[in-house]
């Protein structure tokens, strides 16, 4: 379990002073100018050495991503864009950073912008986050007044930070759709290549990072890459914010070390499973877009990228959704299908048509008003959507259903049998989805 002195986010619950003075008293903005004086290469190499992987879901090495930016300017400005469009069902970590600990993010923006030669950073905040945006803007205004941001500031590097409010579309959490939205266009993902590091915002070199990825970098530089790599297993280093919701006794967002066993995370921070461990049905370990894992497999699972991949799932945003045996698992996954159908931007045919198909067949599965062969047909549809779209929304819509079929097929067949038995006893004629 992580000790309090090792926590990066010291005010994640908003119990302390979140102003600039309070943040400085807790050690933020300490030595920032010295980091900038050490140069861009030192910062990028230190972040690489720390093994920090993107905290937005994909887990791409952050230092490597920063190094893709052109070293020399070709006349075009460089931009840093922070993805604060936190819309993944179950995820609520970034909003706590912006609402209660915004100076970790602002200091991170300054350091990351300097490392990539950017003089402007844009923070794209989810449309529904009203209070979070107000808190973040107030913190930015404080930094301007104190002389930490703007032209000729105390840090010796000109940097402006702008907050942009989204309009409520989940698809704008995809980095290229976010850039389109930021430019004032319809939020639809772009084809890659060209990648944002080459042609991003307004056609200029851009790096898009998650809020948590940016917010942890100042502490990594202050305490050293060696300190950060002391947490977690190889290739899964550092600390992580876990958002635990669902059927636990105390749902919470908590910072702990990577590679913590699932049962330890739940027992130490959440007061255990509602009704005890025998009552655990399934867990979605990384936000709604990763497959669910049965409770029996999940108890001893290691909460990191590799540990959950071995179970056929993923860490994603570390939004842990716990379901006990009172849950209708088929209906829960249908609800996710309905979400993805609603949020598909409609640009790619497999996703536009496939999400609707998956939702409608899942609706039949919830009622049991289906044939057993439709389970295989549903799986085939998910395979035709997965990997055939510009962005990962198609995969995100397909994976929860694949996880359901893989682990809970007997439950689906049982429901079909029950419905068929009741229907045929009343002389009804069953139809297949085809």
From Swiss-Prot:
Tagged with keyword Hydrolase:
no
- What are the entry keywords? 4Fe-4S, Flavoprotein, FMN, Iron, Iron-sulfur, Metal-binding, NAD, Quinone, Translocase, Ubiquinone
Q: What detail does the entry give on cofactor binding?
A: Binds 1 FMN. Binds 1 [4Fe-4S] cluster.
Positions contributing to [4Fe-4S] cluster binding = 345, 348, 351, 391
Residues annotated for FMN binding in this entry = 166-213
| Swiss-Prot/TrEMBL catalytic activity | a quinone + NADH + 5 H(+)(in) = a quinol + NAD(+) + 4 H(+)(out)
Q: Which cofactor does it need?
A: FMN; [4Fe-4S] cluster
Query: Which residue ranges does UniProt annotate as crossing the membrane?
Result: none
Q: Single GO molecular-function term?
A: NAD binding
EC number(s) given by UniProt: 7.1.1.-
Q: Where does NAD(+) bind?
A: 54-63
Family stated for the protein in its record: Belongs to the complex I 51 kDa subunit family.
Primary role: NDH-1 shuttles electrons from NADH, via FMN and iron-sulfur (Fe-S) centers, to quinones in the respiratory chain. The immediate electron acceptor for the enzyme in this species is believed to be ubiquinone. Couples the redox reaction to proton translocation (for every two electrons transferred, four hydrogen ions are translocated across the cytoplasmic membrane), and thus conserves the redox energy in a proton gradient.
Q: What is this protein identified as?
A: NADH-quinone oxidoreductase subunit F 1
